[in-house]
Amino acid sequence: YPAKLVHGHIKWLLNKGIKTIFYPCVSYEENFVPNTDNHYNCPVVANYPVVIGANMPELREEGVRYMRPYFNMANHELMVDRIVEEFAWANVTREEAETAVKAAYAENEVFKHDVQMEGLKALAYMKEHDCKGIVLAGRPYHVDPEINHGIPEMIQSYHLPIISEDAVYHM
């Protein structure tokens, strides 16, 4: 179901006059959980940009650049190579791509750290107040109200601490 919403989002971009749309296929994510061997996205997530390209003729209209390259998030060097290759039309240099990839992965580490720190705060609160909490597991697209149907707000109405699965996966 979430993938179906992409059609509307792409149409919205086109209606706003956006002429370059970058929607990469991502088969492999970073393997950030030690001792696991599966960091492969589901086929829908990994390949839906191809489906969109095949099913939305407006993406093939003159003047529209629809970019759907394959990226392997687990291989930083390959990411640099692919960025240079895919953005050659914009004259992106290898140095620029390396800087961008390094900054993106560094910021992702900051984000993961921040999420874990918030989780630790919630756990400390639960211990201090002798209360239970909820670990809310999901995918990034679950923040869309069309998809989550207000479940996060309903959970919040119980006044329990909510912890992201990303905050505690390492425990």
Descriptions of predicted regions:
Residues 1-171:
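An N-terminal assembly and electron-transfer interface module characteristic of large anaerobic redox
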